[in-house]
């Protein structure tokens, strides 16, 4: 007679969860940050609000963003004028867009990840789909399963309305699924489109205007599995540990609310200060088992909520400028893509590591950290272990 313990042991993988492939995608429409204020105030018929436009121009100038990608084109916005007002009922129009476009953009990223992985898509056992853009039933996970032609028996998990920390959440869940299901291959997808948050300017809600200056559209997909097949699968990073915490005294620091007017975004407290004040505690808890206290000995992937967060974290921890170079580069080239950001940064780190001739996928270093920050204030901390870089 087989015991429960024997069954449980047989169900579990032997090695750590490993990222086996990464794919990314953006909509084709690219907007230049330097000219975006002119476009934004023109399309929202707000050009007469010159003082507010000057404030927005300063926000964009200080954002350190060069360009962003957006599904919303001028033509789409002209066809949906309610989306250009600050608080006009417009949820139906927004929903009709995102329930179609979110899975499509996710498919583009997932297809690239599957191609890099090099295995048959029928070998994908689990699907995790994450988006803050819209809600539907059956969800984007179901739609992506159909679009990709995955097996009907693929085990799906749909994450809606998590926000900017959720790239870390996706990695944490993919790690648990891979390590607790022997032979599992998890496709995890983050897909974000700002059609739910775009709106006209308001003199009384400058925090909403901050979001209009920062957010962009994008998707990223990863394949995660334990015990990579030798000579068939190529590991990129090992997921060593993952944790989530709510920062103290941070209630209401970042809020998002889905209403008839779409998803409204609110910054109510000193978010950069709260994160920088508490980040070392998260680092100490994560790296104490490894006896690591030198934060400059790590490679870094941090959600780029905005330049102020990165500046204060860098100063608080005494990080060398190159530590957040990949993070700042993704912010500059794409803006804040919510949950997808950290996965694009991860892709940037491994590609630059190979291009620059580093010995490991983590910029030549062995250990790394990935941080997600978002509503709550919630922080996700993932400890990464690099592998030997291969061209």
Curated annotation (Swiss-Prot):
Superkingdom classification of source: Eukaryota
GO biological process: polyketide biosynthetic process
Active-site residue list: 164
Classification via CDD domains: CHS_like
Gene Ontology terms, MF aspect: acyltransferase activity, transferring groups other than amino-acyl groups; protein homodimerization activity
InterPro entries: Chalcone/stilbene_synt_C, Chalcone/stilbene_synt_N, Chalcone/stilbene_synthase_AS, Polyketide_synthase_type-III, Thiolase-like
Record note on quaternary structure: Homodimer.
Protein family per UniProt: Belongs to the thiolase-like superfamily. Chalcone/stilbene synthases family.
Name listed for the protein in its UniProt record: Inactive polyketide synthase 2
């Amino acid at each position: 007679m087989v015991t429960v313990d024997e069954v449980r042991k047989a169900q579990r993988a032997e090695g750590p969860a490993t990222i086996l492939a990464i794919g990314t995608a953006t909509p084709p429409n690219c907007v230049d940050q330097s000219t975006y204020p002119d476009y934004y105030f023109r399309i929202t018929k707000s050009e007469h609000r010159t003082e507010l436009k000057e404030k927005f121009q300063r926000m964009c100038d200080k954002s350190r963003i060069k360009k962003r990608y957006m599904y919303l084109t001028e033509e789409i916005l002209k066809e949906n004028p309610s989306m250009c007002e600050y608080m006009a009922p417009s949820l139906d129009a927004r929903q009709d867009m995102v329930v179609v476009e979110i899975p499509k953009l996710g498919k583009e990223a997932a297809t690239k990840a599957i191609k890099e992985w090099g295995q048959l898509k029928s070998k994908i056992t689990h699907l995790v789909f994450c988006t803050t853009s819209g809600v539907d039933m059956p969800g984007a996970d179901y739609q992506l399963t159909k679009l990709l032609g995955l097996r009907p028996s693929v085990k799906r998990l749909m994450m809606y309305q998590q926000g900017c920390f959720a790239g870390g959440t996706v990695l944490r869940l993919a790690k648990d699924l891979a390590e607790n299901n022997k032979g599992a291959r998890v496709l995890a997808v983050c897909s974000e489109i700002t059609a739910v948050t775009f709106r006209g300017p308001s003199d009384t809600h400058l925090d909403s205007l901050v979001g209009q200056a920062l957010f962009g559209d994008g998707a990223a997909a990863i394949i995660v599995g334990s015990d990579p097949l030798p000579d068939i699968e190529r590991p990129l990073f090992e997921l060593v540990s993952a944790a989530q915490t709510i920062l103290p005294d941070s209630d209401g620091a970042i809020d998002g609310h889905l209403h008839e007017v779409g998803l409204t975004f609110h910054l109510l407290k000193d978010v950069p200060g709260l994160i920088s004040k508490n980040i070392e505690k998260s680092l100490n808890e994560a790296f104490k088992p490894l006896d690591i206290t030198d934060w400059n000995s790590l490679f870094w992937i941090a959600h780029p909520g905005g330049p102020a967060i990165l500046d204060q974290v860098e100063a608080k921890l005494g990080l060398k400028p190159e530590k957040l170079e990949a993070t700042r580069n993704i912010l500059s080239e794409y803006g804040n893509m919510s949950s997808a950001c950290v996965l694009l940064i991860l892709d940037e780190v491994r590609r630059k590591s190979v291009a620059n001739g580093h010995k490991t996928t983590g910029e030549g270093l062995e250990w790394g950290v990935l941080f997600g920050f978002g509503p709550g204030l919630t922080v996700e901390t993932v400890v990464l272990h690099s592998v030997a870089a291969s061209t």
